[in-house]
Swiss-Prot record:
Listed name of the protein: V-type ATP synthase subunit D
Record PANTHER family: V-TYPE ATP SYNTHASE SUBUNIT D
GO biological process: proton motive force-driven plasma membrane ATP synthesis
Native species: Chlamydia pneumoniae
Originating gene: atpD
Lineage: Bacteria, Pseudomonadati, Chlamydiota, Chlamydiia, Chlamydiales
Entry similarity comment: Belongs to the V-ATPase D subunit family.
Length: 209
């Protein structure tokens, strides 16, 4: 339902102020949209790279799959997949807070160097790398999701400003301006007619004297 606009000088002033605010804020929104588009592209590349690293780490650990069941290795192998802590933080990108991983700490695996196979170190290193790469891949996807959502929201606002708010406000201003102009012309005409009537009355009065 359309909002009823008062065709007054005060309404004209308010709508003019509104249009000025919209036109001032639109370039800022457009700049943010451009920055977000660039950051989304970077985030897409980063997510793809992290996912690739995770797949490669998975393939490396898969090569040891048959060795996981060896009794001497079971406990330390299981430990190598356990996360002790994740140092998360946030950074501001184009006005948006996105997560970032500073460090992933896993529980240390204790085992006897003499009582375990020589390849165990390599396998444990590969398993830890898999866990870290998985965390990094998940966070990179979350970063991408947040940036894409913000870009969508900003794009909607830019479109709203350009296609609706600014054109509608401009249209309202023109409508009020035309009305006020017509009324001004009418008022001037009425004043002139009133003056003529007064002059005619005076002229008739002079004739009667």
């Amino acid at each position: 339902m359309s909002v009823q606009v008062k065709l007054t000088k005060n309404s004209f002033r308010l709508e003019k102020q509104k249009l000025a605010r919209l036109q001032t804020y639109l370039p800022t929104l457009k700049l943010k949209k451009a920055l977000l588009q660039a950051e989304v592209q970077n985030a897409v590349k980063d997510a793809a790279e992290c996912d690739k690293d995770y797949v490669q780490a998975y393939e490396r650990i898969y090569a040891f799959a048959e060795l996981f069941s060896i009794p001497l290795c079971t406990d330390c192998v299981e430990k190598s997949f356990e996360i002790q802590s994740i140092d998360n933080d946030f950074e501001n990108i184009a006005g948006v807070e996105v997560p970032i991983v500073r460090e992933v700490t896993l529980f240390p695996a204790s085992y006897s160097l003499l009582g375990t196979p020589i390849w165990l170190d390599t396998m444990l290193s590969a398993s830890k790398e898999l866990v870290v790469k998985k965390v990094m891949a998940e966070v990179s996807k979350e970063r991408l999701k947040i940036l894409e959502e913000e870009l969508r929201a900003v794009s909607i606002r830019v479109n709203l400003f350009e296609k609706k708010l600014i054109p509608e406000t401009t249209k309202i201003l023109k409508k009020i301006a035309v009305f006020l102009s017509d009324r001004s012309i009418t008022d001037v005409g009425q004043v002139k007619m009133a003056k003529k009537k007064i002059e005619l009355r005076k002229a008739r009065g002079d004739e009667c004297v």
